[in-house]
Amino acid sequence: MANKKCPVMHGGATEISMSNMEWWPKALNLDILHQHDSKTNPMGAGFNYREQVKLLDVEALKKDLHALMTDSQPWWPADWGHYGGLMIRLSWHAAGTYRTADGRGGAGRGNQRFAPLNSWPDNVNLDKARRLLWPLKKKYGNKLSWADLIAYAGTIAYESMGLKTFGFAFGREDIWHPEKDIYWGAEKEWLAPSGSEGSRYSGERDLENPLASVMMGLIYVNPEGVDGHPDPLKTANDVRVTFERMAMNDEETVALTAGGHTVGKCHGNGDAELLGPVPEGADVEDQGLGWINKSQRGIGRDTVSSGLEGAWTTHPTQWDNGYFTLLLNHEWQLNKSPAGAWQWEPINIKEEDKPVDVEDLTQRYNPIMTDADMAMKLDPDYQIISARFDKDPEYFSDVFARTWFKLTHRDMGPKTRYIGPDVPAVDLLWQDPVPKGRSDYDVEAVKAQIAASSLSVSDMVTTAWDSARTFRGSDLRGGANGARIRLAPQRDWQANEPERLNRVLAVLEPIAAKSGVSVADVIVLAGNLAVEQAAKAAGFAIKVPFSPGRGDATADMTDVESFHVLEPLHDGYRNWLKKDYAVSAEELMLDQTQLLGLTAQEMTVLLGGMRVLGTNYNGESHGAFTEHQGALTNDFFVNLTDMNNTWQPVSNNLYEISDRETAKLKWTATRVDLVFGSNSILRAYAEVYAQDDNQQKFVEDFVTTWAKVMNSDRFDLD
């Protein structure tokens, strides 16, 4: 028998060998901090997409996209000769993964090209949509990212079918491998019903945070009903929770549901069991395409995607008010699609009100509604909104256009990041607007006023940190710009120690007013000054980089409700947990670090510096391994790695560090502190900063990382 053993010492497939995380599943997974580095990016260090996209011929692209919509390809024919519905679903399912709790998901990175999204059950046949777009991506090359093209395709699809769109902004940069930091749920199977192993539901029907979709592999809700059981009122509850977690209110929810279903159709005219493997599991000859039906025709009218079959409206390639006309003026009953999926069909309907077949325009079939569509009619609050839209088509079109813009731009950050000729002039509250601040002032003079105040190093560093730490690299919200730390709700957050914060602001705000500069700048400048003072106390003269120009947001520019999701519930850098959580403190710190956009090395040096600067919450001394608090020394690392010490737990998250010889208690520490000595990777970094010859390197690296955090939301500097 031939020896089929792999002829090389390594494996290219996952079944060949176990990963470290499989051998030691409780180990800290630092991979989420190492993703998206230059080694995976084929464009090179000098490539700047945001500059390249400014060279894009937008009008030519728009013309090409309009032409593509009606250029039906025989390998994947367009329904009714128009790809609009398919392209809208592509854009929608890219943007619809966004959730407010952690800002992850969304259309901003082109992540739908990679697993798991490229193979989700809800994304069946969207691989075909991306292949249809490939000639345009190929043509426009580096001037057009996949992320921008996917989002733009849906917008132009609506425009081509008659909707007056609200606008569009370019500037989404592609990633080059799957995102490892996004938690999609703990279920072990696709479309696992409630109560399955790892279920995302508890209690009556409480959806686990930060999740927004109701099932593993769905973008929103189950179109057949809760766990596949039709009941529009129960589905309405799922819809409301899901869309709220995507930052949509009831009116926006109805608009998106109706507008998304005004055009296009569901596909379920066949046997779903005949579909081939998903893209990520398909064989090489399928070239990245999935769900191929090799037993039957499987395209055109015989396509199977969601399993439901039919269009929602009479004219599914035309923007109109037909969705409400049919939904509200007919009685509906449950039927099964050819693929066996539950769907609602009208009991009595005129033949001319039925949509025609996608291939034979002489044949007509019943329109259909999903369980979520029926919720728009039967839920009392949704019904009122639906009736309003039905009576005022222009109002509906305007609300939908604005909401579609919000959906496709929610994770792009502030308006200063928008690029292109079709950027709306209006400022929208959900964009967290911040006015431009002054940059033409004497920075050193302002710094001198701060230095002359009574504020300590701890006060200034802590306040600057608290202001900046809200930044999320996921949806680019938060940060120090705007100084919203002085406004509701942030001023009253427990994490910000309101009493201390108010005392510090009482000193800094008058300095800002007297100098005619923003409070945002003064808060950061004070933090920088404190770091410089601490470095000097450690024997090093260093200047922290500072770029003036931050503005101060007002209460009118701040949607208080939307900022609740940015409230810190933990902060490893200040050694604080609001309460005990099922997730370990070090894992929470890792998540915080990833959202801040920091690497494992930056996390290490930043935390070590914060510990010796006296920034712990409420003045706690845990992890402050130094006798020189307020001086930017490497004492945290020196004492953490000192084998003359022993470490003993005294409670779940508290440890005592004692002298090995005398047993004298020296310090206390938390899990977050000790993980930098226990995790092999973090210990390697800690040892670098503990070295006798790296004290200056520690100071320099801390300053670099500190400045990075302070400027994380300064998109005007890009």
Swiss-Prot record:
Q: Give yes or no: UniProt keyword Metal-binding.
A: yes
Q: Which GO terms describe its molecular function?
A: catalase activity; heme binding; metal ion binding
Active-site residues, as the UniProt record annotates them: 93
Give, as one word, the top-level EC class: oxidoreductase
- What's any one GO cellular component for it? cytosol
Q: Which reactions is this enzyme annotated as catalysing?
A: H2O2 + AH2 = A + 2 H2O; 2 H2O2 = O2 + 2 H2O
Listed transmembrane segments:
none
Q: Which species is listed as the source?
A: Shewanella halifaxensis (strain HAW-EB4)
- Keyword hit for Metal-binding: yes
- The UniProt site entry described as Transition state stabilizer is assigned to 89
**Taxonomic superkingdom:** Bacteria
Please list the cofactors this protein needs. heme b
Report what the protein is called: Catalase-peroxidase
Note accompanying the cofactor annotation: Binds 1 heme b (iron(II)-protoporphyrin IX) group per dimer.
Q: Which PANTHER family match?
A: CATALASE-PEROXIDASE (PTHR30555:SF6), HYDROPEROXIDASE I, BIFUNCTIONAL CATALASE-PEROXIDASE (PTHR30555)
Give the position of the cross-link Tryptophyl-tyrosyl-methioninium (Trp-Tyr) (with M-246): 92-220
- Family according to the record: Belongs to the peroxidase family. Peroxidase/catalase subfamily.
Role description: Bifunctional enzyme with both catalase and broad-spectrum peroxidase activity.
How does the record describe the protein's post-translational processing? Formation of the three residue Trp-Tyr-Met cross-link is important for the catalase, but not the peroxidase activity of the enzyme.
- InterPro entries with a match to the protein in the record: Catalase_peroxidase, Haem_peroxidase, Haem_peroxidase_sf, Peroxidases_AS
EC number of the protein: 1.11.1.21
Q: Where does heme b bind?
A: 261
